[in-house]
């Protein structure tokens, strides 16, 4: 027995001496074979830039490339070891080059499969979650390869753009809001998954006359791009060559005098129903957009899960039901819709900064702009009378409209009058912008505004949306 123990001890000493002659990388790997391991990595490859769009709008078939790296650059690598996935995070140092930390064991061999991703303008958290934004660049190679043997690791990858990119030219300091573009918001190496958002994107034109690039892709197949400024809104259906993967382009910010293929107004689609928002500038409380029409049955029902094409205004809905609808709409569009306040509604009804001082919303003749008791006995299709100065329809008559302003607990105001109102009750709200003269006529709309019980609903009462930019 003593001889056996002596032999075992001698063998252990020999193993220690043998390990001591190995490189530190290999020693580290042996010591950490069940935990995170770190080895040197040779990276063979490059980053491919974007196709540049020339001033003639024709795509120039040249690509900028880069093989230079900065301290702190990271490449996230998904190694495949047979059916096992090994996650790696490679970091660059100008002093020592690339090193990669990974959990698990790499397969030995060459031309082995891996995926590589490189990020610019991203935030790397301690939990290895990569936080991204509209200005983050993502380059990847889903068919990269690696070779590994005895602690020597080489990764070969050509990192290409995952998105397209676009910028807007205009006046320095001009602030714009963009809709219709989806961007990546996070990357989780642990599950090898990206998350995305189609929320409104805020950009500002810099001193060089353009905004920073937005990196993303069109949210839907319609390829509708919306731009909102401090006093305008435009929408454009973009060509198939715009914002494709690897494409770089630019567009001039449109104006009222020169907007070419842009449609005036912000067009939004929800549950297959498109509706238009009109910019309302000059309001003391800040710029907002108001729906061109009262909320239609088509929009309300479709967002709530029942397909409809009806262009009648929705009515017979309670205030809580309206709130639930708006929450669903915001979740779907990632925009910030709400009911207008009494002041916002009144300002828009009068024509905003384009007001002509009409008695009714858009005219001194009620029949030109309003459905009311003298010309109908039920609600009518929206947008069949003339609009007001801003291009907004039915702010006098058709159906009364909830606003967010509450008269007292559980009693929201109703503005605009409806089809059952007589002519004196469909005038715009008073120039004083106060509600001291509110009428208690309930759903008969005695006066330009009324109020109702919070959870009550009635035929002839609907609502209209506004959108604020955030």
Named regions from a protein language model:
Residues 381, 429-451:
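Surface-exposed intrinsically disordered loops and tails
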Residues 319-433, 459:
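Functional-site microenvironments in short loops/helix caps that host divalent-cation chemistry
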Residues 1-20:
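Sec-dependent bacterial lipoprotein signal peptides
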Residues 266-320, 396-397, 404:
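A short glycine-rich, aromatic-capped structural motif
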Residues 8, 19-260:
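Sec-type signal peptide cleavage vicinity
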Residues 457-470:
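Short, structured beta-strand segments at or near domain termini in extracellular proteins/domains
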Residues 238, 311-313, 382-383, 387, ...:
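Active-site rim elements
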Residues 288, 295, 300-308, 327-335, ...:
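Short capping motifs at secondary-structure boundaries
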């Amino acid at each position: 027995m003593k001889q056996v123990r002596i032999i075992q001890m001698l063998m252990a000493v020999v193993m220690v001496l043998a390990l001591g002659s190995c490189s530190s990388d290999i020693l580290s790997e042996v010591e950490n074979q069940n935990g995170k391991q770190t080895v040197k990595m040779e990276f063979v490859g490059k980053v491919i830039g974007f196709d540049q769009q020339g001033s003639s709008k024709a795509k120039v078939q040249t690509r900028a490339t880069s093989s230079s790296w900065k301290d702190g650059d990271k490449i996230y690598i998904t190694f495949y070891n047979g059916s096992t996935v090994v996650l790696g995070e490679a970091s660059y140092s100008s002093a020592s080059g690339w090193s990669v930390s990974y959990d698990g064991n790499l397969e030995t061999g060459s031309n082995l499969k891996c995926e590589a991703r490189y990020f610019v303008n991203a935030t790397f958290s301690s939990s290895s979650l990569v936080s991204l934004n509209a200005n983050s660049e993502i380059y990847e190679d889903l068919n990269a390869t690696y070779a590994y043997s005895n602690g020597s690791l080489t990764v070969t990858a050509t990192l290409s753009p995952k998105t397209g990119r676009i910028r807007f030219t205009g006046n320095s300091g001009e602030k714009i809001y963009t809709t219709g573009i989806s961007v990546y918001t996070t990357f989780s190496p642990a599950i090898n998954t990206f998350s995305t958002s189609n929320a409104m994107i805020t950009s500002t034109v810099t001193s060089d006359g353009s905004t920073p690039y937005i990196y993303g892709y069109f949210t839907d197949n319609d390829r509708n791009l919306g731009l909102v400024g401090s006093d305008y809104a435009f929408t454009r259906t973009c060509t198939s060559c715009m914002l494709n993967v690897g494409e770089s382009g630019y567009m001039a910010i449109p104006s009222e005098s020169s907007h070419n293929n842009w449609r005036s107004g912000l067009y939004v689609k929800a549950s297959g129903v498109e509706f238009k928002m009109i910019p309302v500038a000059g309001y003391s409380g800040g710029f907002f957009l108001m729906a061109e029409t009262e909320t239609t049955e088509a929009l309300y029902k479709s967002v709530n899960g029942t397909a409809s094409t009806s262009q009648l205004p929705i009515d017979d809905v309670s205030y809580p039901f309206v709130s639930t609808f708006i929450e669903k709409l915001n979740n779907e569009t990632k925009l910030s819709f709400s009911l207008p306040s009494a002041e916002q509604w009144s300002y828009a009804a009068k024509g905003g900064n384009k007001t002509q001082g009409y008695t009714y919303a858009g005219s001194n003749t009620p029949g030109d702009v309003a459905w009311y008791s003298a010309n109908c006995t039920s609600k009518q299709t929206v947008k069949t009378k003339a609009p007001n100065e801003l291009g907004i329809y039915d702010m006098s008559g058709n159906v009364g409209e909830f606003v967010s302003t509450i008269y007292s607990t559980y009693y929201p105001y109703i503005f605009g009058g409806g089809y059952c109102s007589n002519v004196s009750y469909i005038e715009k709200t008073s120039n004083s912008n106060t509600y001291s003269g509110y009428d208690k006529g309930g759903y008969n709309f005695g006066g330009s505004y009324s109020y109702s019980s919070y959870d009550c609903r009635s035929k002839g009462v609907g609502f209209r949306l506004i959108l604020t930019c955030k």
